[in-house]
Amino acid sequence: MPFDHAHWQERFDALRTEHHVPGAALAVFVDGDLHELASGVLHRGTGVAVTTDSVFQSGSVAKVYTATLVMQLVDAGELRLDTRVADVLPGFAVADAEVARTVTIGRLLSHTSGIAGDFTLDTGRGDDCLARFVDACADVGQDCPPDTVISYCSTGYAILGRIVEVLTGQSWDDALRDRLFTPLGLHQSMTLPEEALRFRVAMSHLGELGTDPEPAPVWDMLPRSAGPYGRVLITAADVVRFARMHLDDGVAPDGTRVLSAASAALMRQQVAGCLDTWSFMATGWGHGWALYDWDGVPGYGHDGASGGQFSYLRVVPGSGVVAALLTNGGVATSFFTDLFRELLGELAGVRMPEVFAPPAEPRPIDVAPLAGTYEREGGAP
């Protein structure tokens, strides 16, 4: 079905307002064409409008970029999925010595290492930030044993970023620029705040659900060491261009092969299923991509969150549709869900599941036996 720009702009504006999202950008690739929409403001304090070339923070969508760099190294023969981290990073340590000795690249890519995932540490702005971060992982424990379940692990992606540095001889930032941004023509994608100053940049907003949020106290809440798992600075169109390369099995729009077809397929081949499909909205995970099953229609993508900004990327290979939504606050997940249920339903024939919520008439449950203090490794009680 042709993309009706006026209709989708109207729905985009209405749903953004309904869900108190200050500003958003949307890019959709369908029937061989790229369509871009913008709505709202970059900063509620200044009133500067969002445009289609505005730059937002990616959050965890950055993980797919890092996974792609790793799979390029697999293509080059520098790595295998069963390569042990310790074989690339001598002296690598986490709290569990056996995990440190045996954990593999594949387990980090697929979130099946069991390593505690939310270890965050500001190791400075220098090019040594990832090396210092990995050194500091020696006391990081396990959320669960390896290969037990999907245990979402940002820590593992920082470690993968350091592996990219060691094998390329470049910083992660430079490797990303030279190996992905440049060959794909992603001219408005970057990793550092000073690079983003050249463009119209979205400010994060924070506030109570159901109210119009206010600008965050600072623009960037992540340290540089978070780059491989959480900080690529992007436009919606650039995200779609990146995902199109995966849709086309590793080939850029100009015909340049960026990734082998085999590696592109491995990234979206399920390694493990999600037990908690409500939190992730995914049915499983590959070597980088979150995987979806929309009533029998397969897809892949990733979500991201970064201090008040939220990003959503979905690919429907059967219909050749790619869509990316970037937002700067508000009830973004509800905005995404309502918009993409309509958008993918019309353009890709996808029926997304209803949002997980309590039943209209919940039955009484005695919660007394469940009361207590719960704690997970790497997190507060």
UniProtKB/Swiss-Prot annotation:
The alphabetized list of GO BP terms reads:
cell wall organization; peptidoglycan biosynthetic process; regulation of cell shape
Q: Please give the GO cellular component terms listed in this UniProt entry.
A: plasma membrane
Annotated source species: Amycolatopsis lactamdurans
Q: What does this protein do?
A: Involved in cell wall biosynthesis and may also act as a sensor of external penicillins.
Entry protein name: Penicillin-binding protein 4
Family of this protein:
Belongs to the beta-lactamase family.
Membrane-related topology note: Multi-pass membrane protein
Keywords tagged on the record? Cell membrane, Cell shape, Cell wall biogenesis/degradation, Membrane, NAD, Peptidoglycan synthesis, Transmembrane, Transmembrane helix
- The encoding gene: pbp
What is annotated as the active site? 60 (acyl-ester intermediate)
